[in-house]
Amino acid sequence: MKEVLVLALMLVLIAGASYAEEIKEWDISEMIHPQLKEGLKRVPYFELNSETLGFLREVLGGDFSQLPKDEAVDVRNETLPSGLRVRIYTPKTGANEYPGMLWLHSGGHIAGSPEAEEWLLLRLAKGAGCIIAAPYYRLAPENPCPADIEDCYSALLWMSENLPIRKDRLAVGGASAGAGLAAAMAQMSRDKHGPAICYQFLLYPQVDFVNDYPSHHQINDSRVWCLSLHLAALKWYPADFSGDYVSPALTEDLSGLPPAYILTGTLDIFRDEAVSYAQRLMQAGVLVELHVMPGIVHACEFLFPNAPVCVKIMDNYTNALKEAMK
């Protein structure tokens, strides 16, 4: 019931937003979910600039080999003829075929790696019983857009042809920037008559680089992904933001796209664009399961994976993915 009320409020805010008056920043220390308040106090403030970008990349793309593995999931790397590397997670169930999902990692298009999210991918592969292929797509600014989009689509084509995946159960998913890329893959595959996509699994999606939303300005606390970090990342992501598939929310025709699971939080900087995109998908006849979680910041489970509310969020979307993969 709380999610329904929150969603109704968000739709009113988006529909009636006026930018004639300055939008006030919110104090997330007071508004964050009670279970996350103490944890937030331990998160340092972060400034993204040319000096700290290297640190961010090291944190999100470093050596994770010492982290715990799951004996129920096989993990290996493959290299495509193009040189693109893909990390593959396969449940050890002995099946001849599996549902499959292309997973696109977060990191603002400028950082990140599959290993940084391996703890989650192991959980999803095991819990949903699906093969997950996660490409090391090229990052900006060294590789300007659409390099990332091209790599993601190449990985989608490759996995559909080379992995033991059921042709009727191929999903696309991701978190944050990766969720935006996943939404783009669903559109791109539809338009190019590529692999049939059965499901969009979009966590905290960033889908609109062009339009301004109230949530962009309300969330500007740099302990979480916020306006200042978002604007800094944009400087290193040179792109025609209105170009094909860069901002999936700008696509006029959303009909014929696969069902979508969309997760955001009331304290997520991308909250309003996620809700707006969900609304437009529904208007186009697409089945959408939308969750707007009260008091939740952007990618909260990445920051507080052991908090009960975050565990519940992960359990919920793992179960949703499992149902979609049947």
Regions inferred by a protein language model and the residue ranges of each:
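Alpha/beta-hydrolase superfamily serine-hydrolase fold, recognizing
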Residues: 23-326
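Sec-dependent N-terminal signal peptides
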Residues: 4-14
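Intrinsic disorder/low-complexity segments, especially N-terminal tails and targeting/processing regions
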Residues: 14-16, 77
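Boundary at the C-terminal end of the N-terminal hydrophobic targeting segment
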Residues: 18-20
